[in-house]
Amino acid sequence: MELSYRLFICLLLWGSTELCYPQPLRLLQGGTSHPETALQPVVVECQEATLVVTVSKDLFGTRKLIRAVDLTLGPEGCEPLVSTDTEDVVRFEVGLHECGNSMQVTDDALVYSTFLLHDPRPVGNLSIVRTNRAEIPIECRYPRRGNVSSQAILPTWLPFRTTVFSEEKLTFSLRLMEENWSTEKRTPTFHLGDVAHLQAEIHTGSHVPLRLFVDHCVATPTPDQNASPYHTIVDFHGCLVDGLTDASSAFQAPRPRPDTLQFTVDVFHFANDSRNMIYITCHLKVTLAEQDPDELNKACSFSKASNSWFPVEGPADICQCCSKGDCGTPSHARRQPHVVSLGSGSPARDRRHVTEEADVTVGPLIFLDRTGDHEMEQWALPADTSLLLLGTGLAVVALLTLTAVILVLTRRCRTASLPVSASE
């Protein structure tokens, strides 16, 4: 599936600026424009001989800032003016005949056409991006002016299933939750820029109190956790490394219970991959609740404010190894769960062998980025909604059938009464 979409903005100007958005713009003296509401994501000034384009770094309105290096103007890919990371906007200033802009002469206008391209690329050695590719056509007309509105397409995610591998008493689970963490998410649909709320749990039965840890998490386009491409979310025995880059992913502190661990992940899709499914596989493990967390059993998040790691519980120094990428013995990353004995030394026929570690997969998470994917959305309707639609359809068919029978019987009765009237 093509993971890109086109956001169309027509800019029809006469020596002034006017964005084609539902919000009206007031034209001021000097050929400038002023929105009546919030700052527009793209503002264009068609001047006498130059074209000035100002792009908000919050281009999609999701508070996920784009990078200036991912923006170009025109077929020749003109780069923006130099700006600092602290600025909220990216600016282009080019001549009307530069950057491969096209010119067309009509009966009543001189039309210059070009486009703004946002083409996100993975940061560093990562293989994921968190925003979509967008091509925004720009058009300047002289001397006419007008306004054409366009609404952005909102990419979405679609449903998921959960697969659990466990034995006997210990049951591991990984669920997608609502934002308030109170209930499981009923409609697993996301937009780029949203945050997925994941909750890992261990159901202990009659066992002694246990503490749950997420040792490793990896995202792949198939259920196979060893598939490629892949993106590591948690690594090094509990370091949430996804929060190191442009994401706000983090563990939630404090825990609701020792046997439950919650964390958030900024949603994403794989760059240059036609598959629109993402599976998240986490390796879960437990320790005794009374055991203090250490480098091998921890839950650490990265704080961009302090530029440091911090744990959900336990001393702060247990997270220092996250920066080094070495937290002791090799991680359980991308392998099957290990089975150990939690027996008490009783005779062999009474001993229990259960898993204190397990791989749990949540998926598929289906990412939609085109309005044409509504068929996928319909596939994700809840069971009760499908039954309601089926019942409504059957009721309509029954009503139409009953109406047809009544009409046929009425016509026959009228036909049978005609000879009697003639004899009289």
Swiss-Prot record:
Entry-listed glycosylation sites: 32, 125, 147, 156, 162-163, 180, 272
UniProt keyword Transmembrane helix present: yes
Modified how: Proteolytically cleaved before the transmembrane segment to yield the secreted ectodomain incorporated in the zona pellucida. N-glycosylated.
InterPro entries: ZP-C, ZP-C_dom, ZP-N, ZP_chr, ZP_dom, ZP_dom_CS
Biological role: Component of the zona pellucida, an extracellular matrix surrounding oocytes which mediates sperm binding, induction of the acrosome reaction and prevents post-fertilization polyspermy. The zona pellucida is composed of 3 to 4 glycoproteins, ZP1, ZP2, ZP3, and ZP4. ZP3 is essential for sperm binding and zona matrix formation.
Entry domain remark: The ZP domain is involved in the polymerization of the ZP proteins to form the zona pellucida.
Descriptive protein name: Zona pellucida sperm-binding protein 3
Source organism: Callithrix sp. (Marmoset)
Gene: ZP3
